[in-house]
Amino acid sequence: MACRGGAGNGHRASATLSRVSPGSLYTCRTRTHNICMVSDFFYPNMGGVESHIYQLSQCLIERGHKVIIVTHAYGNRKGIRYLTSGLKVYYLPLKVMYNQSTATTLFHSLPLLRYIFVRERVTIIHSHSSFSAMAHDALFHAKTMGLQTVFTDHSLFGFADVSSVLTNKLLTVSLCDTNHIICVSYTSKENTVLRAALNPEIVSVIPNAVDPTDFTPDPFRRHDSITIVVVSRLVYRKGIDLLSGIIPELCQKYPDLNFIIGGEGPKRIILEEVRERYQLHDRVRLLGALEHKDVRNVLVQGHIFLNTSLTEAFCMAIVEAASCGLQVVSTRVGGIPEVLPENLIILCEPSVKSLCEGLEKAIFQLKSGTLPAPENIHNIVKTFYTWRNVAERTEKVYDRVSVEAVLPMDKRLDRLISHCGPVTGYIFALLAVFNFLFLIFLRWMTPDSIIDVAIDATGPRGAWTNNYSHSKRGGENNEISETR
């Protein structure tokens, strides 16, 4: 985990000192926020978005903010759950439509989300992922309720196919009156600005990060053979078709070469067919779905990490692999060239031929001993991306949007009509009016004043925060007494 420390005890109007590292570094802050992270993608589902939300939330809690997470139910995981440091997660009973994204009618989620926002006294809604219907719903409802909104885009999209056109139009509607947008790379920022026709000044670039203490090299790694590791969802976008062409070609050329593939998805059948056709059962291991805690143990079994993605805004997997001391070979797509310096990554075109050449280059460097030592790679990578830095930069975005005005209904309707086109604009302006009327009806049925306010688990007045601070002070007093 990236952040395990306790949060400060400050109040909204006064400056607080929050410890953000084991050393003597302290950060002065003038305000705290009540933040609600919303996305369809969260634990127990595994992926980059899920990890980003969890790690960012933990570091924001450490910095003194109140953070809750809203997602949909996963199996029997329903209701309210508490994670490390008092992080409260609402698992809502909403129907999943496709690929862990909920079905939406826009209005059905308003009663639940409104109740949570009021009960938790939320001031900022932070939605994640263009693929999440719940994230778009939360943005729409938050603006109706007069709350500040932030959106983080984790993906890249094209402009030609039907699905991209529809998603881009939805993104245009969702983001036209959102206070601020965060992208994970400069390539992603350019893509999002073009897709949603945004003002670049309200779009910030804050990359993902990795906890270096969770991804360390194995000093006892075997060198009697060469192992290429792939950890990815086995879907088309991750280039699994390319991987199916690479495996037989390199296995035929290098008898001491093995593959370890972690991940699950509809393209697994292709890899199983390749393994069966070329009789590579003892050289190609398919591990299936991995829990995040097991990823490091898989990575350190290899020498080279292969990423075959066809599109990627920011690939956390290559940072994790480099932190474990592996040589990274990756496709040159999206924001990947921004992630690691040239001496730590071999970039290739998204083709079987180019990737095979890149892997052969890495194999030659490995056999000749010209690759940097895994410990040296780890020491370099651990200084690049840290969750505390991500949290500090995100906090500045929150500070900025907290003083911005939320558009009143009349100006919001004008913005929708002028920004989204004559057809889409009028349709969503009408939906915004219906949503506002539905909100008035809900407030008449159950006024905000009679909704019970939840006891804060995190934040300046959080029960978890105060208990942690009290026990910490008690421990320090005991240490002083013992030294006397």
Curated annotation (Swiss-Prot):
Disulfide bonds: none annotated. The keyword Transferase applies. One of its GO terms (molecular function) is phosphatidylinositol N-acetylglucosaminyltransferase activity. It comes from the Eukaryota. InterPro entries: Glyco_trans_1, PIG-A/GPI3, PIGA_GPI_anchor_biosynthesis. Catalytic subunit of the glycosylphosphatidylinositol-N-acetylglucosaminyltransferase (GPI-GnT) complex that catalyzes the transfer of N-acetylglucosamine from UDP-N-acetylglucosamine to phosphatidylinositol and participates in the first step of GPI biosynthesis. It is a single-pass membrane protein. Belongs to the glycosyltransferase group 1 family. Glycosyltransferase 4 subfamily. It comes from Homo sapiens. Residues 1-421 are cytoplasmic. Its main location: endoplasmic reticulum. The chain crosses the membrane at residues 422-442. Gene3D superfamilies: Glycogen Phosphorylase B. One of its GO terms (cellular component) is endoplasmic reticulum membrane. The modification Phosphoserine is found at residues 21, 24. Glycans are attached at residue 467. The gene is PIGA. This is Phosphatidylinositol N-acetylglucosaminyltransferase subunit A. PANTHER family: N-ACETYLGLUCOSAMINYL-PHOSPHATIDYLINOSITOL BIOSYNTHETIC PROTEIN, PHOSPHATIDYLINOSITOL N-ACETYLGLUCOSAMINYLTRANSFERASE SUBUNIT A.
